[in-house]
Amino acid sequence: MLKQSERRRSWSYRPWNTTENEGSQHRRSICSLGARSGSQASIHGWTEGNYNYYIEEDEDGEEEDQWKDDLAEEDQQAGEVTTAKPEGPSDPPALLSTLNVNVGGHSYQLDYCELAGFPKTRLGRLATSTSRSRQLSLCDDYEEQTDEYFFDRDPAVFQLVYNFYLSGVLLVLDGLCPRRFLEELGYWGVRLKYTPRCCRICFEERRDELSERLKIQHELRAQAQVEEAEELFRDMRFYGPQRRRLWNLMEKPFSSVAAKAIGVASSTFVLVSVVALALNTVEEMQQHSGQGEGGPDLRPILEHVEMLCMGFFTLEYLLRLASTPDLRRFARSALNLVDLVAILPLYLQLLLECFTGEGHQRGQTVGSVGKVGQVLRVMRLMRIFRILKLARHSTGLRAFGFTLRQCYQQVGCLLLFIAMGIFTFSAAVYSVEHDVPSTNFTTIPHSWWWAAVSISTVGYGDMYPETHLGRFFAFLCIAFGIILNGMPISILYNKFSDYYSKLKAYEYTTIRRERGEVNFMQRARKKIAECLLGSNPQLTPRQEN
């Protein structure tokens, strides 16, 4: 808020006399607007700059009825006031032709006839109101000696509002904040319904762009830092402080040395499990671990390594689940869903293997066992999703996922165009190639693979048209793929670069704040000094430093 003028006084109620009411009914129709002389600031001219007209559809109906009810109430109160004979001299009618306002230290004189033309605005209601209490409720302060109304608002925006009362057109300065400008317009009650709507486009574009940037900034901050509710940990009935320390240990890797060690161990186990999953398919690496007391162990060594990794992932997930302050937020988190998908296939596979073993003992049909085997292969395939656990420790992966969420419309359009191209060109090539002897374009579904490879500009060469018309369609398909791949990639890359840099900056700020409590370099120097002091106790304090 701007400071009010030093000449402001406390509110003082003064009843209006009959002369004032009569003078208000015979106001001059001239619209004399000008600045007051003396210590007050003069009226500024229209500010130079880039302006845009702004329109907002007038909301009739409830607002119109409310305005009529207010006027009826004010007329009734005015009739009660005029019944009493006022005391003291009356003001000249000439002084009642203008309304004196002071906005942020700048004084203005507005003609009553201009304000009465916009009775729904704040100054219009102030000018047309006959109740002093109603007038005082519309302003911040009132000075009786100079008959001046004070408002603690932005004078730069009111200059545009003042020009609106003068010309009937609101000019929007491009340098103003859209949200701040709309807030000021809401306070003054300016509706602006007589300006062409086409001039509103520039202002709406800036407003929408600002809203989108603020939304993205909020989501990026939420991605960069773990939102924890202090009151939730404080109000927990069961082991609140212990769960808070465990939460910091699992979710904030830079809050302590132990948390950093757990983060490094988690990334290491992810890489080891992925390597073990890949090497487990190599026949030379499938060596048995030996024989135990219960008989030969048929599981390879790499499967034992994978089981160890899955045990760590399970323990990590359970600790996060036990320490979370909000189960709903935990369930909605994408990273926690990835953790669950990473460990769930192994337990489903073990469960199905148990049922499969019982089925063999009971002599079930081969068909049912074969179906279970297919399900087991799908479960094994789902284990590759555990590599997505690296997104918890990788800024680039999280920025890539955030980019896909923000650009889902562009990605959807890209997939739609690719599908349309595949269906169109595969049907076209099939129509001219299916009669060729020993052709690979036997059906349209068989042609989909060729169209997909051609649109992606890969070109394996396993399928190719032989007729001249088919080659012409192939050229069109490749050209369509080049144009299609070039349009959205630049947009996605620019947004990914922007989101990655912002997310990296927010993460750096969060890490610096978390490291404020734990200074690893200072702790390392302290440990080295303690070791040196233990090996040579004759060191002086100066030598220790």
From Swiss-Prot:
Domain notes per entry: The segment S4 is probably the voltage-sensor and is characterized by a series of positively charged amino acids at every third position.
Membrane topology: Multi-pass membrane protein
Function according to Swiss-Prot or TrEMBL: Potassium channel subunit. Modulates channel activity by shifting the threshold and the half-maximal activation to more negative values.
Medical condition linked: Cone dystrophy retinal 3B: A rare form of cone dystrophy associated with supernormal rod responses. The disorder is characterized by reduced visual acuity, photoaversion, night blindness, and abnormal color vision. At an early age, the retina shows subtle depigmentation at the macula and, later, more obvious areas of atrophy.
Tissue localization of expression: Detected in lung, liver, kidney, pancreas, spleen, thymus, prostate, testis, ovary and colon.
Family from the record: Belongs to the potassium channel family. V (TC 1.A.1.2) subfamily. Kv8.2/KCNV2 sub-subfamily.
TM segment ranges: 156-176, 262-282, 337-357, 375-395, 411-431, 472-492
Record protein name field: Potassium voltage-gated channel subfamily V member 2
SUPFAM superfamilies, per database record: POZ domain, Voltage-gated potassium channels
InterPro entries: Ion_trans_dom, K_chnl_volt-dep_Kv, K_chnl_volt-dep_Kv5/Kv9, SKP1/BTB/POZ_sf, T1-type_BTB, VG_K_chnl, Volt_channel_dom_sf
Example of a GO biological process term: action potential
Gene3D superfamilies according to UniProt: 1.10.287.70, Potassium Channel Kv1.1, Chain A (3.30.710.10), Voltage-gated potassium channels. Chain C (1.20.120.350)
Motif Selectivity filter location, chain numbering: 457-462
Organism in which the protein naturally occurs: Homo sapiens
Annotated region (Disordered), positions in chain: 74-93
Subcellular location: Cell membrane
Extracellular side: 177-261, 358-374, 432-444, 466-471
Topological domains annotated Cytoplasmic: 1-155, 283-336, 396-410, 493-545
Sugar-modified residues: 440
